[in-house]
């Protein structure tokens, strides 16, 4: 320290530069002895490329690599079991195959009270003959749809049950019983899907359904009026819209 006090500023700068170059040379030599030029604390923490200075690094980096890449697709094999969970609901809510209907009699019971359970249906129809299946239709949340399927081993037993219970009230609601055939099965599916959307006449929204019906009435009335069909464009107020657009355009031109 005493020597630097006697030296000039330029000499001190030159001395510092010479010391830095000497330290750099020593650092390179130590790196070669250790087996790596990029070892040290950086290699220990971040998993560097060092040799002897980063001996514990490969063991720490291996678990990180094993969690990604190859092992990631393994959890995606679990969704293959999801269809098995919904298989029971699909068979309960749907209808059987054609071969199953030919061997016995199948009844479709509708307009049921939502409190009627599977046990109630089985107890009600078991007195007419042996049953293959008697179950209420439920949605995925467990709520009753108000319909049920009753499978008899013999078609004659199904006809007896239909004649006996069709129109008879159960828990305050009259049962509607039909013998399921291929034609009834094909007709019931679109009716059920449309009834959930708010009716057959308006499956896609109320205003659109009424507009379509109104156009049909106008067409039938305009046939006897000759040129009455030309009045429909006036009801759309297209001229007023054009006038409004023209006024807006003129206003923009005036301001500019």
Curated annotation (Swiss-Prot):
The keyword Nucleus applies. Residues 32-54, 196-212 have a biased composition (Gly residues). InterPro entries: ALYREF_mRNA_export (IPR051229), FoP_C (IPR025715), Nucleotide-bd_a/b_plait_sf (IPR012677), RBD_domain_sf (IPR035979), RRM_dom (IPR000504). CDD domains: RRM_THOC4. Residues 105-182 form the RRM domain. Residues 15-26 have a biased composition (Basic and acidic residues). It comes from the Eukaryota. Disulfide bonds: none annotated. Its main location: nucleus. PROSITE patterns: RRM (PS50102). It is found in: Nucleus; Nucleus speckle; Cytoplasm. GO terms for cellular component: cytoplasm; nuclear speck; nucleus. Residues 186-195 have a biased composition (Polar residues). Keywords: Chaperone, Cytoplasm, mRNA processing, mRNA splicing, mRNA transport, Nucleus, RNA-binding, Transport. GO terms for biological process: mRNA export from nucleus; mRNA processing; RNA export from nucleus; RNA splicing. GO terms for molecular function: C5-methylcytidine-containing RNA reader activity; mRNA binding. Gene3D superfamilies: 3.30.70.330. Residues 15-85, 186-256 are annotated as: Disordered. Belongs to the ALYREF family. Functions as an mRNA export adapter; component of the transcription/export (TREX) complex which is thought to couple mRNA transcription, processing and nuclear export, and specifically associates with spliced mRNA and not with unspliced pre-mRNA. TREX is recruited to spliced mRNAs by a transcription-independent mechanism, binds to mRNA upstream of the exon-junction complex (EJC) and is recruited in a splicing- and cap-dependent manner to a region near the 5' end of the mRNA where it functions in mRNA export to the cytoplasm via the TAP/NXF1 pathway. This is THO complex subunit 4-B. The gene is alyref-b.
């Amino acid at each position: 320290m005493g020597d630097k006090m006697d030296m000039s500023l330029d000499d001190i700068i030159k001395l510092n530069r010479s010391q830095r170059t000497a330290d750099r040379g020593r650092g390179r030599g130590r790196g070669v002895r250790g087996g790596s030029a990029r070892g040290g604390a950086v290699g220990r923490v971040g998993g560097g490329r060092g040799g002897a200075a980063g001996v514990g690094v490969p063991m720490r980096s291996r678990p990180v690599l094993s969690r990604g890449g190859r092992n990631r697709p393994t959890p995606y094999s679990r969704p293959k079991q999801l269809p098995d969970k919904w298989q029971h609901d699909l068979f309960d809510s749907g209808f059987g195959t054609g071969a199953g209907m030919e061997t016995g009699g199948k009844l479709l019971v509708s307009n049921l009270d939502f409190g009627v359970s599977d046990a109630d249906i089985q107890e009600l129809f078991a007195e007419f003959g042996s049953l293959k299946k008697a179950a209420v239709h439920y949605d995925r949340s467990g709520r009753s749809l108000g319909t049920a399927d009753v499978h008899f081993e013999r078609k004659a037993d199904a006809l007896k049950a239909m004649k006996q219970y069709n129109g008879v009230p159960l828990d305050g609601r009259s049962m509607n019983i039909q013998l399921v055939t291929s034609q009834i099965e094909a007709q019931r599916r679109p009716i059920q899907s449309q009834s959930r959307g708010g009716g057959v006449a308006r499956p896609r929204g109320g205003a659109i359904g009424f507009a379509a019906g109104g156009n049909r009435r106008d067409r039938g009335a305009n046939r006897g009026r000759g040129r009455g069909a030309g009045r429909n464009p006036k009801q759309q107020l297209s001229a007023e819209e054009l006038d409004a657009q023209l006024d807006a355009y003129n206003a923009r031109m005036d301001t500019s």
